[in-house]
Amino acid sequence: MSEPGQPEWWFYHLKRTTLEQAAGPLLEKCLERGWRVLAVSPDIRRRGALDAALWTYNDQSFLPHGQAEAAGLDASKQPVLITEAPENVNKAAVALLMDGADMPIHAEFERCMVMFDDGDAPVRGKARSLYKAASDAGLT
């Protein structure tokens, strides 16, 4: 387990699967560990696609989650909160960063996971910059 302000940074370079397909198993593992997740994307389409994918991820189980934009949602109670804003309102241990979402290297999470598609050159470049910064700080 990492210290506050010293999260472990993990990077997922997606080449053969979509982010929505890859996110389900990762989120399931986080929840099995008792971790809450803040899933951050600046792209409203991605947030909607992830929400839809999590509803149908596994026929045998349900991944509890909510979108911060949903009317009447108590964001603080969501085990997985899908949001545009990087504010940790659900007291998550893990930040899942998508589509070039920003997060300080010394964020107050136990783990920061960056998922990026190989075909998206700008996002891939940003992920490389984050990797270098996290690596230089000894957080990878």
Each PLM stretch: what is its role?
Residues 1-47:
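Long, hydrophobic N-terminal alpha-helical segment
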Residues 52-92:
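Helix-adjacent hinge/juxtasegments
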Residues 45-49, 122-123:
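Short, charged/polar "capping" segments at the starts of alpha-helices
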Residues 26-29, 54-58, 112-113, 129-133:
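Short, solvent-exposed amphipathic alpha-helical segments in soluble enzyme
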Residues 78-115:
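Active-site-adjacent structural patch at catalytic or cofactor/ligand-binding sites
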Residues 5, 33-36, 50-59, 63, ...:
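Terminal and domain-boundary regions
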Residues 111-140:
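Glycine-rich, aromatic-bearing surface loops/beta-hairpins
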